[in-house]
Amino acid sequence: MKQGLHPEYHHDAVVKCACGNTFTTGSTNAELKVDVCSKCHPFYTGKQKILDTGGRIEKFMKKYNLNQK
């Protein structure tokens, strides 16, 4: 096998989020900067917004005079 082919692996790579959260993981980069992490992502924080598309369907039905059966 060729020597020096693979990049150096860092077992204690630091991940820094835009929200200020930091944690360590393994990576070929010594430091990673991310925009979203599990501490600030809406899915994990419970601040997820649910979009209601029912109003759009009703508007379409009314516009084209379609009756639901």
Swiss-Prot record:
One example GO MF annotation: structural constituent of ribosome
GO BP annotations listed: translation
Details of cofactor binding: Binds 1 zinc ion per subunit.
Chain residues that bind Zn(2+): 17, 19, 37, 40
Alphabetical UniProt keywords: Metal-binding, Ribonucleoprotein, Ribosomal protein, RNA-binding, rRNA-binding, Zinc
Pfam families: Ribosomal_L31 (PF01197)
Source taxon at top rank: Bacteria
InterPro entries, sorted: Ribosomal_bL28/bL31-like_sf, Ribosomal_bL31, Ribosomal_bL31_A, Ribosomal_bL31_sf
GO cellular component, one term: ribosome
Cofactor field: Zn(2+)
Keyword Metal-binding: yes
Function: Binds the 23S rRNA.
Family the UniProt entry places it in: Belongs to the bacterial ribosomal protein bL31 family. Type A subfamily.
Assembly and binders: Part of the 50S ribosomal subunit.
Name the record gives this protein: Large ribosomal subunit protein bL31
Organism: Clostridium novyi (strain NT)
